[in-house]
Amino acid sequence: MGLIFVTGGAKSGKSKFAENLLLGMNNGNQKNIYLATSVAFDEEMKAKVALHKERRQDKWLTVEGYKNFSETLKDIFSDETKNNMLVDCLTNMISNIIFEEYDINWDKPSEKDFEKCNISVEKQVNELINIVNRFENVIIVSNELGMGIVPSYPLGRYFRDIAGKMNQKIAEIADEAYFVVSGIPMKIK
């Protein structure tokens, strides 16, 4: 299979679909790596992470991180087996990278601010793309943000735009792509 991109709205069932899809690809000798990109910074996010972990049970090896993937996954790469990996999710990864840029005034961001974030986000997305070939199968999950209203504030518009561009980048190189709506996956590539 190679690289598979799974997108959909919030609570659309995309993670559950991606998890089941990847488990079905395991040849019996592979590890199922779950690269969790969320940072649990409040109670709601902690509960969401706990729910995901409970659903995965012991079928997965969870690795947490949203950047510097060669370093984050170095222990996985020491194994000669071409394992499978699920990245959940690209939009969380992007938001974490954006919020590392503490010196940006998001009420009045400049073009330089956007360029700075673009460089940081693209660097990490490219690093993620570069490690894909070290796995048998990789599924990248991301939120589809471009179907709603135009955000009324600069940070919201920027996030929607950069996430959309990175979704396009992954979808373009993916071997397959799925759009999940109300728990129903539709193959779009």
Residue ranges of each PLM-predicted region?
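N-terminal/domain-start segments enriched in small and hydrophobic, helix-friendly residues
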Residues: 1-3, 80-82, 136
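Structural motif
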Residues: 5, 84-86, 139-141
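Conserved P-loop
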Residues: 2-77
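Conserved inter-motif catalytic segment of the P-loop NTP-binding fold
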Residues: 43-127
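Residue-level signal for inorganic ion chemistry
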Residues: 18, 52, 86, 143, ...
